């Protein structure tokens, strides 16, 4: 076990730092070849936390493949999750997992967040949903426990060094080439969360309809050229089979075809040049995290991006229901923007929301690819809440605290002047640096804009040597 040394996963919740657990796996036979899979019983080496290596045997048989396919296509069947969970528990029983499990359960009991990193040099083990590891006594899966998140890491990879961008943009790119998608719902979810926090999101600029490989790269290049790069890429489309694995059904620029199925290596080639600013890729598509046929060397779309150095990729290892995709967008951006949660905590929030559906396994489909070396406090939407000597402006209303009384007084004074038909002139005076500008810009202005009837327009000007002339010119611009 490694102890986290950063802040707790839920920002502002006052919780302890997350408990960091790890599960590292490798194949005994041909350990240097990730794809040397054999459809038979195989021996693997398991290291749980700081425990020593222990050998464990896993049997790949038709019953297991049938259960995995049932999880993917018939999520309403109730026995396969328990069978797979029990298999995973028995596989780990003779290793150091018992101690890690004990630590995990103690952390859950005291409501401490837990982050379990699963890594494997054997590619086939990523086909297993480790969230289903069950507890012998309770039968509960570790993935259903409160405040527990799993992240999947490919060993010996590194995240491309981040180029920090304050208030980096969100780009929603969607394609209906593979069938209709609920684009309007996803746009509304992102736009609503951004609007509530004054986070920049322009439906004309930040929504890329009928996305193709060419238009996606062009949009990313244009954002970089304008010095407003994309921090979060939200891809909404259908998944589709491609060779032995799965890809994304994007629109085609070719007159001879309407659909281009983009596999992981191809998407990796497109997005890798932007890895220093792309902090999160959300793949809202069926099988975006599905590695496909066991032993194939392509892997999943999410895994390809992760291995190339992108910091965080959130995808679905199974088909994602339309309702589940909608809930994912609503909860994810609500958590990141409205509640200012870390990505790790936001994934827990999304999973909990998805788990409320009795006939779907969307909660189990959700898969986060990230590296333990990057820490436990991932914030893909970087917002600096402290302005230093700079004043708080309206877009920073969410981070402006401690002036509620003064804001209410100013608001009441202005409304009182209007009601009494008196000159509508209010002076705010004070010593330099006490926050006069912030009080107006991040306090009063948002309060006026929040009124039910949108009757207010605001102007900002400097009086200069001729204040009347400056004021007259500014007001003239309103007509």
What positions do the PLM features span?
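Caspase-like cysteine protease fold
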Residues: 142-154, 255-276, 334-385
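Conserved beta-strand elements of the Class I
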Residues: 19-21, 168-173, 457-459
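Short boundary motifs at domain starts and secondary-structure transition points
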Residues: 11, 103-110, 155-167, 380-381, ...
């Amino acid at each position: 076990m490694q102890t986290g040394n950063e802040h707790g996963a839920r920002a502002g919740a006052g919780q302890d730092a997350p408990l960091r657990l790890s599960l590292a796996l490798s194949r005994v036979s041909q350990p240097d070849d990730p794809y040397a899979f054999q459809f038979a019983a195989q021996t693997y080496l398991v290291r749980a936390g700081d425990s020593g290596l222990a050998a464990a045997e896993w049997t790949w048989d038709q019953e297991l493949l049938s259960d995995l396919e049932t999880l993917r296509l018939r999520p309403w069947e109730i026995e396969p999750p328990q069978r797979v969970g029990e298999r995973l528990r028995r596989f780990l029983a003779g290793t150091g997992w018992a101690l890690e499990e004990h630590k995990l359960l103690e952390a859950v009991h005291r409501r401490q967040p837990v982050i379990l990193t699963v890594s494997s040099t054997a590619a086939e083990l990523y086909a297993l949903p480790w969230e289903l590891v069950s507890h012998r006594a309770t039968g509960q899966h570790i993935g259903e426990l409160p405040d527990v998140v799993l992240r999947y890491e490919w060993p010996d990879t590194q995240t491309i060094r981040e180029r920090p961008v304050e208030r980096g943009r969100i780009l929603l790119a969607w394609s209906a080439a593979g069938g209709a998608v609920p684009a309007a719902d996803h746009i509304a979810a992102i736009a609503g969360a951004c609007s509530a926090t004054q986070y920049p999101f322009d439906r004309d600029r930040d929504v890329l309809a009928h996305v193709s490989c060419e238009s996606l790269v062009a949009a990313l290049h244009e954002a970089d050229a304008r010095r407003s790069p994309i921090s979060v890429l939200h891809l909404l489309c259908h998944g589709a089979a491609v060779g032995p694995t799965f890809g994304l059904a994007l629109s085609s620029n070719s007159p001879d075809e309407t659909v281009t199925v983009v596999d992981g290596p191809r998407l990796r080639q497109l997005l890798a040049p932007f890895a220093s600013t792309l902090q999160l890729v959300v793949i809202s598509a069926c099988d975006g995290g599905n590695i496909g046929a066991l032993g194939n060397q392509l892997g999943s779309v999410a895994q390809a991006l992760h291995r190339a150095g992108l910091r965080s990729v959130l995808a679905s290892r199974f088909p994602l229901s339309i309702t589940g995709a909608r809930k994912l967008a609503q909860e994810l951006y609500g958590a990141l923007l409205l509640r200012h949660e870390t990505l790790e905590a936001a994934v827990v929030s999304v999973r909990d929301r998805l788990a409320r559906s009795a006939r779907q396994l969307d909660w189990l489909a959700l898969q986060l690819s990230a590296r333990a070396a990057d820490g436990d406090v991932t914030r893909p939407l970087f917002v600096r809440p402290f302005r230093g000597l700079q004043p708080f402006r309206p877009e920073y209303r969410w981070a402006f605290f401690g002036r509620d009384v003064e804001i209410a007084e100013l608001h009441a004074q202005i409304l009182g002047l209007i009601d009494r038909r008196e000159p509508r002139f209010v002076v705010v005076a004070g010593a330099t640096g006490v926050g006069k500008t912030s009080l107006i810009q991040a306090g009063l202005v948002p309060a006026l804009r929040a009124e039910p009837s949108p009757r207010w327009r605001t102007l900002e000007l400097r009086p200069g040597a001729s204040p009347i002339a400056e004021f007259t010119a500014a007001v003239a611009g309103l007509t």
